[in-house]
A protein has these predicted regions:
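Charged, low-complexity intrinsically disordered terminal segments
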Residues: 1-409
């Protein structure tokens, strides 16, 4: 990727950069776009699939110019079929539908092939990120990408979860479009955002779609990036995204949030294994910050869980309050001093922080942070159990072993 600074795009430069993306070749380095602080008209925190899927579907069904979906996990099932039906209906109305999905998370060339054939036959343009050979196609049933190893691309997984409707409504969160997020087995959230900041989400999507070989007519640029009314856009909000290489604005922001907290700090994450970030959490607690760490009691990755639990003793000794949510807590969020909220897809483990495509929304608003506490943190705290230290020589040895392996997990 080269410089970690990336390409700085100001508020007036988004259209210019988008036009370059739509008319010329796009390399991986062109995805490294760093945005200045933006503005949102509204930011809503929606917790659990039963709360975020219905309005997300309603937004898709209301689309009049375009629907863009970037999803790590979009698979057949009750939830997936409902979304597929909504997308097919828009295609029948003549609305362009574009998708970027991850080969590992969505399996569009394997078990979900029929599901994606239905979408592409209806007219959806689908690009696939393949961690071993990130070569593109319009549709998922072309050349057999992924059969040939490309070690340089190993780990280039697209972990993002984004929906952009008409360039005016954006969704960013941690959940896939899959049944286990809709039936309560996985506990997650999405942020629904409107206002000028949606242009940033749209540009990130367009950059990835074009890098993967998708075609977007430059004549539609005005529809893709409609002029947003700034009059009511008073909420500071900025899109941060990581890309493979050395472009890691989310990682930088997480470190700053952990280091800058002075009064309170909430960390919500299913995979807390990065030693450097864990030490930052400990230091925050030691300097008197009230720290709550929300993690799952029953994680879906037992190796990561063992590595994480290895650090519980040091975290507890530092004064961190560990809260284990009873089901698979899958959300990723940070709240600093009741004012700053960072939420999206990035986990506190090495691959997310340094290798995957990730996306978060940074919101600097006491009212949005309070909304997060009311809808997520307070209810989660009420049903969570205190985190425990590993007990017994065997349990501690297993935890220590997996902690050593955590950069690979």
């Amino acid at each position: 990727m080269g410089s970690s600074l990336g390409i700085a795009v100001g508020p007036d430069g988004i259209r210019e950069h988008a036009e370059r993306l739509l008319t010329g070749p796009v390399a991986l380095r062109d995805l490294a776009v760093r945005f200045p602080e933006g503005r949102a008209s509204s930011v809503e925190v929606l917790v659990e699939g039963s709360s975020f899927y219905p309005p997300m579907l309603a937004d898709i069904r209301s689309a009049s110019s375009s629907v863009h979906v970037n999803q790590f996990g979009f698979r057949p099932g009750r939830v997936g079929e409902e979304f597929a039906n909504a997308l097919v209906e828009k295609l029948r109305e003549g609305i362009p539908v574009r998708l970027v999905v991850d080969r590992q998370g969505s399996d569009p060339e394997g078990g979900a092939r029929g599901f994606y054939e239905r979408l592409t036959q209806a007219g959806a343009e689908v690009c696939v990120v393949r961690a071993t050979k990130p070569r593109a196609q319009r549709g998922v049933l072309g050349t057999g990408g992924g059969k040939h190893w490309n070690l340089g691309a190993l780990g280039h997984i697209d972990h993002r979860k984004v929906v952009v409707v008409d360039g005016r409504i954006g969704w960013v969160g941690g959940a896939g479009i899959e049944d286990h997020f809709g039936d309560g087995r996985f506990h997650d959230l999405f942020l629904r955002v409107t206002g000028p900041v949606v242009e940033q989400l749209q540009l990130v999507f367009l950059a990835g779609f074009r890098w993967l070989g998708g075609e977007v007519p430059v004549s539609t640029l005005a529809e893709l990036l409609p002029s947003a009314d700034d009059a009511d856009a008073q909420i500071p909000a900025t899109v941060l995204h990581n890309a493979p290489g050395s472009f890691r604005p989310i990682t930088e922001a997480i470190g700053r949030i952990l280091d800058d907290a002075t009064a309170t700090l909430d960390v919500v994450n299913p995979y807390v294994t990065d030693r450097g970030m864990i030490r930052r959490i400990e230091r925050a607690a030691r300097r008197g910050v009230r720290v709550r760490l929300f993690v799952p009691a029953n994680a879906n990755n037992w190796a990561c869980a063992a590595a994480q639990q290895h650090h519980h003793a040091a975290l507890l000794d530092a004064g961190v309050r560990i809260l284990e949510y009873p089901t698979m807590l899958h959300a990723k969020a940070f709240v600093r001093d009741g004012q700053e909220l960072l939420a999206g897809t990035c986990n506190l483990e090495a691959w997310s922080l340094r290798r995957f495509f990730e996306i978060d929304l940074l919101v600097d608003s006491g009212s949005v942070a309070a909304q997060f506490d009311e809808r997520f943190s307070a209810p989660a705290e009420a049903v969570s159990s205190p985190g425990r230290r590993l007990e017994g020589a065997k349990e501690r040895a297993r935890g220590a072993a997996f902690a050593l392996l955590s950069p690979l997990l």
